Amino acid sequence: MKEIKRGKRTRYSFERVQTPIPVPNLVEIQTKSYQDFLENGILKVLKKFSPITSSKSDLRKEKGFSLEFVSVRIGEPQNTVQECKERLLTYTVPVYTTVRITDNSTNEMIEEEAFLGYIPYMTPRTTFIINGAERVVVNQLVRSPGIYFVEEAKKTSGTKPIYVAHFLPVRGAWLEILLNLNDEVFYARIDRKRRINLFLLLKALGYSEDLELLSLFPYWIDVEDEYTLQHSEGLIILEDVKTKNGGLIAKRGDVITQGLIEKLENSDIQKIKVAHRYAVNTLEKLNHVYGENIEENRAYIEIFRKLRPGELPRINAAKIFLRNLYFNEERFELSEVGRFKMNNRLEEAYRKYLIEVEGKDPQGVEEVKYDETSNVLTPMDIVLASRNLIEIDKHPGTMDTKDHLGNKRVRTVGELIRIEFERAFSKAVFMIQEKLATYTSLDKISVQSLINVKSIIATINSFFATNPLSQFMDQTNPLAELTHKRRLTAVGPGGLKRERARFEVRDVHHSHYGRMCPIETPEGANIGLITSLSVYSSIDKFGFLITPYVKVVKGKVTNEIVYLTADEEENYKIAPSTIPIDEKGNIIPENVTVRYEEKVLYVNKNNVQFIDVAPNQIVSVSTSLIPFLEHDDANRALMGSNMQRQGVPLIETEAPRVGTGMEWEAAKYSGTLILAKHDGIVKKVDAQKIVIHRIDENGKEMYDSMGNPMLDIYELLKFTRTNQDTCINQRPIVNVGEIVKKDEPIADGPATDMGELALGKNVLVAFVPWEGYNFEDAILISEELLEKETYTSIHIEVYETTARDTRLGPEEITPDIPNVSKEKLRNLDEDGIIRIGAYVQETDILVGKVTPKSESDTTPEEKIIRSVFGEKGKEVKDTSLRVPHGIEGRVIAVHVFDKEKDGDLGPGVNKLIRVYVAIRKPLEVGDKLAGRHGNKGVVSKILPKEDMPFLPDGTPIQVVLSPLGVPSRMNVGQILETSLGWLAMLTNRWFATPVFDGAKEGDILPELYKARKKFGLEMGDFEENPSGKVILRDGRTGKEFDHPILVGYMYVMKLIHIARDKIHARSTGPYSLIHQQPLGGKAQFGGQRFGEMEVWALEAYGAAHTLNEMLTVKSDDIRGRNEVYKAIMKGKNIPEPGLPESFKVLVRELRGIALDVRVYDDEGNEIDIEKL
């Protein structure tokens, strides 16, 4: 065990593996990507459309103007992050571009800077603030452009496979080359529509001679192999066949006949070069349909006929049509990534082509690369893909797997926004061309008026506001925030559809190792589609996920770190990081287990090429926070990972006694801590700010050139609301005079303790059934947890109201509210706004507001008062902002925005008032608690501490869990955590047990026994074979329980599923306008739905009157419910129900589709249902 420093705390770590590299910056994927967009992406898009020339309808009837973009400049944000949040603004920066306009007739030019618009800017916490709300742009995992060799799904069983070479561009039509083994013919499918003969396409691309086509698919026949020779009848010879004496047996282009076979058998010839049967069949089929030796132009016309059957084929139109599909950069784009993938995939096929078709020396082409650079398809691409299909037929194992990570790439923030920016700008280009054409001379051109800023900004803003990849940030706690920024999603625009995603797409694949976490994923419909990046994973320049490995040479681990993509990794044998290594870096065992391709092999240590960098390389940040993960079932680990993100920040934070060593990294990169920017000495500390005087390497205080001290001032966030209504409150953890190092934590945020993540509390637990109160995952807790406020959390709700202009005059914010007692107004100030610090309960007034009443609402008496007192007697309606049901708390802030001071607040709004109420939520029955191993439960009873079971020294247990929650769930990690937690508490130490490299049972139990013996707690355990169990006594009777019980300290979190937020009751409330039925849900103060199945239940009981009531007066019989209310108030019998509104709605809907529906009574008289 060794000591390690984590944040401001020292932990004792059980790690055995020395990790050669530190944990990388966990949010770098976001920052780097967006920075690249600002620095290079915008300019690249502008350059792509440069130069823009004026359109043909030029006023000057001569050479027009051309416009090009020279450079881009990014300005400074206008508002701070905090201002944007408070005033519901978007945090943006202005973008300027330098534009050069040239007069093409005189070559004169002007250069001017133009404003491109405001673009949302990433905050230091890698989020965006859009209309006051923090949002995150999630990384999208999409199929990489390139070429894929796959098998087409069979339509009928018993048929042979169809192999497909699928060209997938970033933009443009698809092209698929098919090899149909049923008729042994090559086809090309163009743009997912029509299938044509492949040779027809190749003829159009310049391979006009039949023999030239066939020679692309050569094949050598061994004449001595009688079986092959006999089956070669019908094939076409590609080279003259001569005997050793020079005698000609067959010419190039001859068809092999039975007679020729006999001649060959009797000759001294060993090999002949023929065309592959598939090529011969394809040519025969082509000639059968179109006649022999069709030339290039005819091929174009036939393709055009096939694709556009109704149109008259003209050669020029046909050529342009095909060129536009695959060979025009404006219509078809492979992209740099697509070309890179395609060159790599076709490299082997290209070498074979050089040897077989061009006759190159095999030795000379071993190192040759296929280095095509075109951004569109080339005829060679199509030829190589077709040839490779024959190889696929021989070796079906070389087909591509769609789910391999080598075939998927990540679209990060920068790229997603660049795509939107490009889309917006491509529309603006036409406008620029049109406007340029209207100018007659250079000096009259106004650069700013050429560029339409509005359309560009509108597109980018709509991306942030509406695109499914721009998400409202999960800010429940720092881990939720960090995980959200590291999320990968396969759904969204250009991705998969949730309903159509196959099981294979969602499953764990061997290529995910070290790149994508196999554990952290949601449990619902998105399982496997939304995942998380692994701890050490990052992205290469093409967007492929890479992970680091340490190079191993001849059984010795070097210091060289190599990052590999999923494709590159397939070629190497990689050992796990936990294999034993001596001090010099030599692998100790002779044979080790390695990963190779998708297999696990047992090889000699000299064959190992790489070794993992860390044991937690495979998992995400959330999962690597679970101690003893190696002892948990994967399904429960998944729940543990997900539930840590739901932990509520508590009033008093406490880091886990049993951690994994990742708590510091998770907190550091979450952005909730304040880290020192430079080395320095703390000069001042209070609740609001920390002042640090910088020091140099020698520890001397630094001063600027004017002799002023160089101070870093850190402002602390106090009681700020998050997106999920939890509370951000930063607290200093340094003292005056303390020396701090750069990147050292100086203030804790929510759910952090001494710089480490602290989502829950270390509580004393016992695994024992207790009177059925912990049946089925229920949890019994001690009142002690309430007394100490262990699980009390602060939540901040915001309530908002506006004073608007109405038709009858403006609304008014005032304390002068009609028919409200002085008692209710006691906390309002002279403007009618609640004072800060007031304690409020449901229905209390937060902001007094009155709205003018319409004339129709006034009674005759009020009209007389109006005529006497004039405007003062004008009647107003009370529309004050009140505290909703079920809420009580303290007002901590009030923000008032005025139209005159703060600018536009929206149409017709004169004043906007926002009131923040802090609500204290202690632990209650019904709240959800969870450990880190997927062990969750609901509080069933809060017992007085004197009734709780207690230890031999009298310490009462704090939480009683059911022992039956462990065996079937197979999350034994919680047992080991409990025992190690007890050892940590008894010895007052903090432990780190990293995942896959943590403490073993033998490390914990003997040490725990020694510590217990020291404190006299060894009852129920034995030194020879310690179990960690103890004899407990029942708090009510004082008697011992029958058997020793497992006791210890477990880290338990309170989750955001809080009972008091969900509990809800309604007597009378709002109704739906159309159906006149009560609304649903707590937010609408709705009722309980009495659904179809509940109706069946009443029908089954024969409870006719109850059923009648449910379907009428308690639901949507408007007249009936009013009559019932009156009858109850007057103590009369309940009247007969009327007609439900839903029946009227049905009749109206039938009339809406032109059906004449009438209703008659028993005597046949027509009834007007609207009057009922």
From Swiss-Prot:
DNA-dependent RNA polymerase catalyzes the transcription of DNA into RNA using the four ribonucleoside triphosphates as substrates. GO terms for molecular function: DNA binding; DNA-directed RNA polymerase activity; ribonucleoside binding. InterPro entries: DNA-dir_RNA_pol_bsu_ext_1_sf, DNA-dir_RNA_pol_bsu_external_1, DNA-dir_RNA_pol_su2, DNA-dir_RNAP_su2_dom, DNA-dir_RNAP_su2_hyb_sf, RNA_pol_bsu_bac, RNA_pol_bsu_CS, RNA_pol_bsu_protrusion. It is an enzyme of class 2 (transferase). Belongs to the RNA polymerase beta chain family. The keyword Glycosyltransferase does not apply. One of its GO terms (cellular component) is DNA-directed RNA polymerase complex. It comes from Thermosipho melanesiensis (strain DSM 12029 / CIP 104789 / BI429). Pfam families: RNA_pol_Rpb2_1, RNA_pol_Rpb2_2, RNA_pol_Rpb2_3, RNA_pol_Rpb2_45, RNA_pol_Rpb2_6, RNA_pol_Rpb2_7. Keywords: DNA-directed RNA polymerase, Nucleotidyltransferase, Transcription, Transferase. PANTHER family: DNA-DIRECTED RNA POLYMERASE I SUBUNIT 2. SUPFAM superfamilies: beta and beta-prime subunits of DNA dependent RNA-polymerase. This is DNA-directed RNA polymerase subunit beta. Its EC number is 2.7.7.6. GO terms for biological process: DNA-templated transcription. The RNAP catalytic core consists of 2 alpha, 1 beta, 1 beta' and 1 omega subunit. When a sigma factor is associated with the core the holoenzyme is formed, which can initiate transcription. It catalyses: RNA(n) + a ribonucleoside 5'-triphosphate = RNA(n+1) + diphosphate.
